[in-house]
């Protein structure tokens, strides 16, 4: 399920933003070797289907906030960031997240694609600031 959502999100971001580029840069905090291998395989599948190369860049979760802030200041943010909920509001306010593009992706996929709670937690004002890709319930 996550594979399908990530591939769909990458595709939609490409088309929604009307950016003409050959590559997508994807930062991930899933840095364990088995998970990196799976993400690399998904990137190759995406490239085979679209002709667009995805560069999967591992970023340790503890370094993500600092690295994203520095990349934003340098004007060198990746196209897609796999991140936790804690970053949604501050990054939306700082302009690190493209709220309009993310909102358009959710609209294109349809809100019924997502758990209502996940969408509510990803809101910034009246818009969805980040595309939920995982929703866990802890009991």
Regions found by a protein language model. Give the residues of each.
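Short helix-initiation/N-cap motifs at beta->coil->alpha
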Residues: 58-67, 86
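Sec-dependent signal peptide recognition
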Residues: 3-9
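Short alpha-helix C-terminal cap/hinge motif
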Residues: 40-56
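Sec/Tat signal peptide C-region and signal peptidase I cleavage site
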Residues: 17-22
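Short helices/loops that flank or line small-molecule/ion binding pockets
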Residues: 65-76, 93-94
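Extracytoplasmic "Venus flytrap"
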Residues: 24-39
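Hinge/lid segment of periplasmic solute-binding proteins
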Residues: 85-136
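Structural recognition of the beta-strand scaffold that forms the well-ordered cores
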Residues: 25-27, 55-58, 79-82, 130-132
């Amino acid at each position: 399920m996550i594979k399908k959502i990530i591939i769909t999100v990458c595709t939609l971001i490409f088309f929604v933003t009307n950016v003409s580029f050959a590559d997508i840069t994807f930062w991930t905090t899933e840095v364990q070797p088995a998970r990196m291998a799976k993400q690399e395989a998904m990137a190759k599948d995406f490239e085979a289907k679209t002709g667009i190369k995805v560069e999967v860049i591992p970023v340790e979760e503890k370094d993500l906030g600092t690295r994203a802030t520095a990349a934003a200041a340098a004007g060198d943010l990746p196209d897609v960031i796999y991140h936790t909920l804690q970053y949604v509001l501050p990054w939306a306010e700082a302009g690190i997240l493209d709220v309009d593009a993310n909102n358009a992706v959710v609209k294109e996929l349809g809100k019924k694609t997502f758990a209502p709670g996940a969408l509510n937690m990803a809101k910034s004002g009246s818009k969805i600031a980040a595309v939920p890709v995982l929703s866990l319930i802890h009991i």
